[in-house]
Amino acid sequence: MADIRDAMMERLLDDAGIREGMRVLDVGCAFGALTFLVAKRVGRTGHVVGLDRDPQLLSLARTKAREQGLSNVTFIEADLANVPAEQGLFDAATGRRVLMYQPDAVAALRGIARAVKPGGLIVFQENDASIGPVSLPPLPLHIRVSEWIWHTVDREGADLHMGFHLAPAMEQAGLSVEHVRAEASLQTPKEHHAMGPILRAMLPRIVRYGIATEEEMGIDTIDARLLEERSKANTTYLGEMVFGAWARKP
């Protein structure tokens, strides 16, 4: 089954106009998940530069790129607000769940815009905790999992409402916003988004902040238990809203 959130991102890239032959900067790329989506879209005549501050994540991204046989990607260690000048100017910049972690999202967007050509695209997707979790009837385990994740993100100083703040931040950064949207991250008994890998990746942080213990989470069985809870209730679960927007550099 295709990843629900990747499908949202693919639609956003499509509608924004990320296309074959483009040279794209993917900021806060981590291990390259979005970088690879963009790389497949721009094709052999295009190129994607993934940028992150974490050398361990970048090493993992390079390994994954080799495993996927992608020759049109490069990964560099740098701060997203200060893209090295030697990289030149890009046709577009992309990011996913990145601005929410910036102490000043407007300043970060201004720095990113400096690396984009005049008229170039800046495309971002940001999650937002303002709405959700919601289901009828309520699903206690789903609510707990959502709290584990969002309480951890909150303790790390992230903006839990970056989705709603996305378009205004782009405008304040001097960009011309062309479109903003919000889609619900939904799960049903038949549509499933795996939470186990997310919790496993966040495990050290969740435990460190005292939000939950490893035993309490039961990561190895969490996805089966979530699916069982939804199936027994035969209901749709709205986890959170996912905002997307694109703008152009004047």
Label each residue range with its predicted role.
Residues D91-A105:
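A short SAM/SAH-binding and catalytic strip from SAM-dependent methyltransferases
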Residues L25-V27, F31-V83:
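Class I SAM-dependent methyltransferase SAM/SAH-binding core
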Residues V123-H192:
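Conserved catalytic/acceptor-binding region of the Class I
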Residues A2, E178-Y237:
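C-terminal helical/coil "lid" or tail adjacent to the Rossmann-like core of SAM-dependent
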Residues D3-M22, L37:
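Conserved alpha-helix/loop element of class I SAM-dependent methyltransferases that forms part
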Residues V106-L121:
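A short glycine-rich, Lys/Arg-flanked "PGG" loop and its adjoining helix->strand segment in the class I
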Residues N82-A92:
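A short acidic, Gly/Pro-enriched loop at the edge of an enzyme's catalytic core
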Residues A173-S176, V242-P250:
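Core SAM-dependent methyltransferase catalytic element
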